[in-house]
Design a protein with these regions (language model features):
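A helix-boundary/hinge signal
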Residues: 1-47, 52, 124-126, 133
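Family-specific functional microsites
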Residues: 27, 43-192
Length: 192
């Protein structure tokens, strides 16, 4: 087990140093635990990024945003509905055509937005940056993002989306959540 995890040196070093059995065991357990956690994190991140690169899986958008195996700042938002709005969009737990079509086996390139005439796939990027149906809400968010971060959402594409979603500022994350919630409400009213 130690060899498999590249840790036999710990055992050998402690034997040569005349450490007690308890010291050796404690060091092996401590190091093995840390190594196991590291391997687990690497496997999870690899899976997430592989899914986002293929554009076929549920983790497509999430994988483009997730950079590290840490708690995301938006989880500190006190308002449950705001936190939920960001979570649902990040995890693709929504009803955009990109997800609805996935469940009924519609080809990805045929999952077109029904709320505008751009003829684009209705995915998270289209929803946040492009769909004219939400332009009123987007203008306010765009102004704030430009003032606070110097990012012009109109031209930044996925890089801009990622910069917003990875913010360390809970205030900006709250504004993003309000934007998302307003867009969902508008989308629901357009669908009824």
């Amino acid at each position: 087990m130690l060899d498999k995890n590249g840790l036999s040196y710990i055992f050998l070093n402690h034997i040569n140093c005349k450490s007690t059995s308890k010291q050796i065991i404690d060091k092996v357990i401590e190091t093995l635990e840390a190594r196991s956690k590291d391997i687990f994190k690497q496997i999870i991140m690899h899976h997430i990024h592989n899914s986002s690169n293929t554009n076929t899986g549920k983790l497509g958008f999430y994988g483009k945003l997730k950079e590290s195996f840490d708690k995301e700042i938006y989880l500190n938002i006190k308002n449950f509905n705001n936190r939920k709005a960001i979570s649902e969009l990040r995890m693709s737990a929504h009803k955009l055509e990109i997800e609805k079509g996935r469940y009924v086996n519609i080809n990805r390139n045929e999952r077109i937005c029904k709320n505008c005439d751009l003829g684009e796939i209705e995915d998270e990027k289209h929803f946040i940056l492009k769909c004219p149906a939400y332009s009123v809400y987007r203008e306010g968010l765009s102004r704030l993002i430009y003032q606070e971060l110097g990012i012009d959402l109109k031209y930044s594409g996925l890089v801009g989306i990622k910069a917003i979603f990875l913010q360390n500022d809970v205030n900006i994350m709250n504004k993003l959540a309000v934007f998302i919630r307003n867009c969902w409400e508008k989308r629901t009213s357009l669908s009824s």
